[in-house]
Regions:
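Extracellular glycan-modifying ectodomains
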Residues: 1-451
């Protein structure tokens, strides 16, 4: 009887310890974010205005969920068990593929073709790039756009068999429109897919250094007209790399992948901290020319090769793209690199540049109106006009003009809404009556814009 009672006590003690220990160690544990997550802060009893924080219990619940003891170890153990036993992961962000390859779940829509661009969206995304190209060329700057392929666009053979790859994807639809609208584009899909060497990390969403090297060589052949040689920069060593996807599902793990190491001769400016900096400036006295690159996280591995190839280079993660920042630098060329899974950003985040002036068009009045907003802009001497023509019959391949009393301007066909537009207009037209003109069944028509 005593032995049985002792067994109960030990069992209860073990369970109690398991429950209490994660709470008990919280004051001494510094929790780090997993992947790109934002950890909840400790809640305040009162708000900034001095009133009682009625949401304190919910906020504390979020804080506890993000900071309890041994959180990383528990997440890692859980995903190791589910991955081994069920061949899946208990993760909203990461997908387990074959041979322990990891993929972003956010790329599934691209991979399966579940959210294909409409004809209008394909035209609009390419047209935004065309307007950026026009602005650059008018300011004596070359322009080029490229797409960093999703990992499963190149390594679909490592995806779970339950997902079927689409025959057409948004990148292809956009590429067709860019060709029709004469947007300068470098196709990295063909270059990378034709290469037998593994060019992406198994447990990361990005290309490895060899993949970045091949991408850079393809870009530089177009941008500088000559083959770039980087094999001489390889130092014969390897560097360990911990994948971003691996850290999300196995935050307490310590496995790495070996990556090719290079020795470059370019130099960062004194403001440089890391490859994640919003803006990076480099110099290389042994190279010529200058480049401005709008990039995303794929630029972490890509930028060293471009920095090595140009006398002066600027790399920026700012989004929306600020074209006025480019003209301030006055580079030889602007390169825009965007990962495949974020191509929708071209439809949602309008580039910051003055709306180009256009010749007035004879347009018939539809007798209708559309909602628009006039907001302050960051560019000196301009304001930002945004709106949505979703109630109008706009042709798929129609530009959008803004008719002011003193001029006609073209808006970027992107922003918020189903049929959005954004235009940075001169301040002197802010108080004028504005209209939106567009093609409808091949004919120019206009509607009033109501604030």
């Amino acid at each position: 009887m005593q032995v049985k009672k002792l067994g109960y006590i030990l069992f209860v003690g073990v369970i109690a310890t398991i429950c209490i220990l994660p709470v008990a160690v919280m004051p001494w544990q510094t929790e780090k974010a997993v992947g790109n997550e934002q950890l909840a802060s400790f809640p305040e009893l009162r708000k900034e205005d001095g009133s009682f924080n009625t949401g304190i219990l919910n906020e504390f619940s979020d804080y506890f969920a993000d900071h309890f003891g041994f959180r990383h170890e528990m997440i890692t153990l859980n995903d190791q068990l589910t991955g081994t036993m069920l061949k899946t992961l208990d993760s909203s962000s990461v997908l387990l593929g074959k041979d322990d390859w990891l993929f972003y779940k956010s790329t599934l829509a691209d991979y399966t073709g579940a959210e294909l661009f409409t004809a209008r969206q394909s035209y609009a995304a390419a047209h935004v790039l065309g307007l950026m190209q026009e602005y650059c060329e008018e300011n004596g700057i070359g322009f080029c756009f490229t797409i960093a392929p999703n990992k499963n666009s190149l390594y679909g053979s490592q995806m779970p068999a339950r997902y079927t790859a689409a025959s057409v994807r948004n990148a292809q639809l956009l590429q067709q429109q860019m060709e029709q609208q004469n947007v300068r584009y470098v196709d990295l899909f063909k270059t990378l897919s034709d290469h037998e060497e593994q060019l992406y990390y198994r447990r990361d969403s990005h290309w490895n250094m060899r993949g970045a090297q091949l991408a850079a060589q393809t870009l530089l052949k177009e941008l500088k007209g000559s083959e770039a040689e980087f094999d001489s920069c390889i130092n014969g060593k390897t560097s360990p790399h911990t994948g971003d996807l691996y850290e999300m599902v196995y935050p307490a793990g310590n496995e790495t992948e070996q990556d090719t190491a290079y020795d470059f001769t370019y130099r960062y400016d004194e403001k440089f901290h890391s490859a994640d900096d919003i803006t990076i400036h480099t110099e290389n006295s042994a190279a010529d020319g200058s480049i401005f690159v709008y990039r995303d996280s794929f630029g972490i591995n890509l930028h060293p090769f471009l920095a090595q190839s140009y006398g002066n280079a600027c790399f920026s993660r700012n989004m929306p793209y600020r074209l006025t920042a480019v003209t301030e630098e006055q580079p030889d060329v602007l390169l825009v690199e965007l990962v495949e899974r974020n191509l929708n950003w071209l439809l949602e985040r309008a580039p910051e540049m003055p709306a180009p002036e256009r010749t007035a068009v004879p347009a018939a009045d539809t007798g209708t109106s559309a909602k628009a907003q006039r907001k302050d802009g960051r560019m000196e001497g301009t304001f930002c006009l945004t709106g949505d023509l979703s109630g109008q019959r706009v042709d798929d391949d129609s530009p959008i003009y803004i008719l002011a009393e003193t001029g006609t301007y073209e808006a970027s066909p992107c922003g918020e809404g189903i049929q959005p537009f954004t235009a940075y207009l001169p301040q002197n037209v802010r108080e004028q009556q504005l209209k939106a003109a567009f093609l409808s069944d091949g004919e120019w028509v206009f509607c009033a814009l109501d604030d």
